[in-house]
Amino acid sequence: MTLQTQHNVNISGGTDRVRYFISAGAYTQGGLFKEFDLPYNLSYQYNRFNYRSNLDIDVTKTTTLSMNIAGNVNNASKPYTGQGSAGMLINMYYSTPFSSPGLVDGKLVNASTDYPDLRMPFTGGSGMGYYGGGFMRTSNNTLNADVQLKQKLDFITKGLSFHIKGSYNSGFTSYTQASASVATYTPVLQEDGTIAYKKYGQNSQLKYEDKDPAKSRDWYMEAALNYAREFGNHHVSALLLYNQSKIYYPSAYSDIPRGMVGIVGRATYDWKNRYMAEFNIGYNGSENYAPGKRFGTFPAGSFGWIVSEEKFWKP
């Protein structure tokens, strides 16, 4: 059993032309692992602080500016295993309760059983393998920001609008990890009926290891014309959009950025929300392909019929 707490604060308000929203939260969760009689404190736990701020401004009656920023800072400490939380729980689940007494008077005791390796033969895991092995602490910081400008263009034709949007995201993760070894004991039955413990190995001090930090950064922008209009029972819409993005430090070939650009078109029609048709086309490209093969055209179309809107279907 572990204790966890969560606290959130939200503030919102504004005027007829300006609206804002601010949120902050803190989350803390204790660790499931408890260490006994070790010369260091591992402090297995997870802490997170997150924040968000949204601001919408009606610049004019037809122009809206939106700015959003969000992020979180979290720190996690877990046993030094190279595994995720799921892997550790699975190993504890697979370990046999009859294989060893475990901790006795602060000693890690390995008793002889039918399975002297402390685990079922087909699982390869043991919950006691995490005792005294060290720790891994991860500190992660992420930031997300975007800004968008919307402009109604009804003065040109009713239902026409334009928007431009840009976003930026970044992340940085640092690691602190240290390994250690712990002595184990095997019980030996003495002639007088008492039990003595034979010691193997020594409790060692933590040995800190270097691990490179991880980082990520990307940006995205788009500009689009939108059109939506009703003519009696006829509904039509159209979209023309340009977008561009770039990702730095991707997981594969982290020193090579990955960029994409595209133009998208879409047209839709429906009659009484009963018969529908849609056509899409995209012209997209990536700088990661060879020159002359970076762009492609991708069309798509569809038709729909909502039969439940027919008169013969209704009671």
Predicted regions: what they are:
Residues 1-12, 96-110, 178-281, 286-290:
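Outer-membrane beta-barrel transmembrane domain signature of Gram-negative proteins
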Residues 2-25, 29-32, 42-123, 136-140, ...:
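Flexible loop and strand-edge segments within Gram-negative outer membrane beta-barrel domains
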Residues 4-8, 46-52, 140-146, 218-222, ...:
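Transmembrane beta-barrel architecture of outer-membrane proteins
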Residues 7-15, 53-57, 145-151, 223-227, ...:
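Residues on the lipid-exposed face of transmembrane beta-strands in outer-membrane beta-barrel proteins
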Residues 16-17, 32, 62, 152-162, ...:
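Short loop/turn motifs that connect adjacent beta-strands in outer-membrane beta-barrel proteins
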Residues 19, 64, 140-144, 157-163, ...:
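Outer-membrane beta-barrel architecture
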Residues 24-26, 67-73, 164-170, 238-244, ...:
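Transmembrane beta-barrel strands of outer-membrane/channel proteins
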Residues 31-35, 76-80, 171-177, 187-188, ...:
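Outer-membrane beta-barrel proteins
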